[in-house]
């Protein structure tokens, strides 16, 4: 525990969303189509209109994700409180073969809006170092409106070649991973989480081209080119379309294997990839003259590029009494980053998910994940040098730079499939050495993640 001099009262209540869950639970007793538990949408089929639109090629969606978190013990500031953050996503997917007769062509448009505050910033991490992960993954990239997807995709040669162009993020296609957990270390593209200055995950978009080729059964290779433009991250540039501010390009390549295992054809997915950024990047230790920047105070040395690689593995390994829609799946992630320029130089993650654990709850799921995030040794070396130059060795001194090493995150959740349009996932998270700082107490956090489709 390292308390700030001033603490704030508990954050905004989340009772309205618990009421939403209660509405979903109680709706089964009513015949109202708008809240039918078996409907794909909370607001129903609009008298059959939505199904009619789907058949014509129009798929309109309004989705919501809300995440609450409360610190139960530990962290930098153990004054108990809660934080809530959320996201709305409004979009349309169009089958242009049905609409315009353009063979094997699709269009996607999505705007997002994020709100709220993050417990990691307010309680878990030392403000001088931060929490490397986040206990609320949906927070971040500016609490604002953004154009998140605006792309056209077309397939050729009976679907073997897939080309997508427009505005979208790298994690939509490369280093992709589900986002059922609430902790950031188990959600989405992990490259973007630890190399976020160049790899922009949802909800940020940039001009991009992705080409994917199915060269053998279950095997794919894809390459991409993404605009490297830091101005896209700015809160006021959520709908920026121009290329002003572009610094270079991010070039990822990835090999994908999607096997079906055993007599029950249990699905798996394995990804091996590499990225290269042509944009300049600051060295984490050296200055412009090749001397320790923490000693000289000069500008950091500018490197001409940045790179890294990743591995993602997901595999269902059992079914449940012969039902392949239920059963145990294993997952793992590994990312390795440029030691000259990246604060995090490597990350590992392991976990399990069991779908349909109980016959009475066949659509529920249970997940457990553990992650390790390692801070570049040169970052720690510079922090120690800065403290020596300043003559500071007292952690409580505001000018002290905390020494960062390794942060560990773990999460256990139970996903309640309330209806076909509402899932609620209460969870417990444990963070060891928040920010990789040994002086910060390990933190225990309770959370709840709500996902719904209107």
Swiss-Prot record:
GO terms for biological process: carbohydrate transport; monoatomic ion transport. The keyword Transcription does not apply. It is a multi-pass membrane protein. GO terms for molecular function: porin activity. Residues 1-31 form the signal peptide. One of its GO terms (cellular component) is pore complex. Induction: By glucose. Its main location: membrane. It is found in: Cell outer membrane. It comes from the Bacteria. Keywords: Cell outer membrane, Ion transport, Membrane, Porin, Signal, Sugar transport, Transmembrane, Transmembrane beta strand, Transport. Substrate-selective channel for a variety of different sugars. Could potentially facilitate the diffusion of diverse compounds, dependent on the presence of a hydroxyl group, but is presumably restricted to carbohydrates. Involved in the transport of glucose, mannitol, fructose and glycerol (sugars able to support the growth of P.aeruginosa). Facilitates glucose diffusion across the outer membrane. Belongs to the OprB family. This is Porin B. It comes from Pseudomonas aeruginosa (strain ATCC 15692 / DSM 22644 / CIP 104116 / JCM 14847 / LMG 12228 / 1C / PRS 101 / PAO1).
């Amino acid at each position: 525990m390292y308390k700030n001099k001033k603490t704030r009262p508990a954050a905004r209540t989340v009772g309205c969303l618990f009421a939403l869950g209660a509405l979903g639970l109680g709706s089964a007793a009513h015949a109202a189509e708008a809240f039918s538990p078996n409907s794909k949408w909370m607001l129903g089929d609009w008298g059959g209109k939505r199904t009619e639109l789907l058949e014509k090629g129009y798929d309109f969606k309004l989705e919501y994700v809300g995440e609450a978190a409360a610190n139960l013990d530990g962290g930098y500031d153990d004054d108990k409180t809660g934080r809530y953050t959320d996201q709305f996503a409004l979009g349309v997917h169009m089958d242009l073969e049905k609409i315009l007769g353009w063979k094997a062509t699709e269009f996607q448009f999505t705007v997002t809006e994020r709100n709220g505050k993050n417990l990691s910033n307010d309680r878990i991490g030392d403000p001088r170092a931060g929490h490397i992960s986040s206990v609320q993954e949906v927070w971040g990239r500016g609490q604002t409106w953004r154009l998140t997807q605006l792309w056209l995709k077309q397939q050729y040669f009976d679907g073997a070649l897939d080309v997508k162009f427009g505005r979208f993020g790298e994690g939509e296609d490369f280093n992709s991973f589900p986002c059922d957990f609430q902790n950031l270390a188990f959600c989405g593209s992990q490259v973007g989480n630890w190399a976020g200055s160049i790899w922009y995950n949802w909800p940020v978009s940039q001009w991009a081209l992705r080409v994917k080729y199915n060269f053998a059964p279950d095997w794919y290779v894809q390459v991409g080119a993404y605009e490297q433009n830091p101005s896209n991250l700015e809160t006021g540039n959520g709908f920026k379309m121009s290329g002003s501010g572009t610094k270079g390009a991010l070039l990822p390549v990835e090999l994908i294997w999607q096997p079906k295992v055993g007599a029950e054809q249990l699905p798996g997915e394995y990804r091996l990839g590499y990225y290269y950024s042509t944009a300049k990047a600051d060295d984490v230790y050296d200055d412009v003259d090749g001397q320790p920047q923490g000693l000289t105070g000069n500008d950091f040395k500018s490197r001409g590029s940045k790179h890294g690689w990743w591995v993602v593995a997901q595999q269902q390994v059992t079914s449940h009494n012969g039902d392949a829609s239920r059963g145990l799946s294993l997952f793992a992630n590994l990312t390795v980053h440029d030691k000259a320029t990246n604060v995090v130089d490597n990350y590992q993650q392991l976990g399990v998910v069991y779908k349909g654990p109980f016959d009475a709850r066949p659509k529920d799921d249970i997940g457990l994940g553990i992650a390790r995030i390692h801070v570049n040794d040169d970052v720690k070396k510079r922090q120690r040098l800065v403290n020596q130059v300043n003559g500071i060795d007292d952690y409580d001194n505001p000018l002290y730079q905390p020494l960062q090493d390794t942060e560990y995150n773990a999460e256990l959740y139970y996903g309640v499939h309330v209806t076909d349009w509402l899932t609620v996932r209460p969870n417990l998270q444990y963070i060891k050495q928040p920010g990789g700082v040994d002086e910060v107490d390990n933190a225990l956090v309770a959370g709840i993640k709500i996902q719904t489709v209107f």
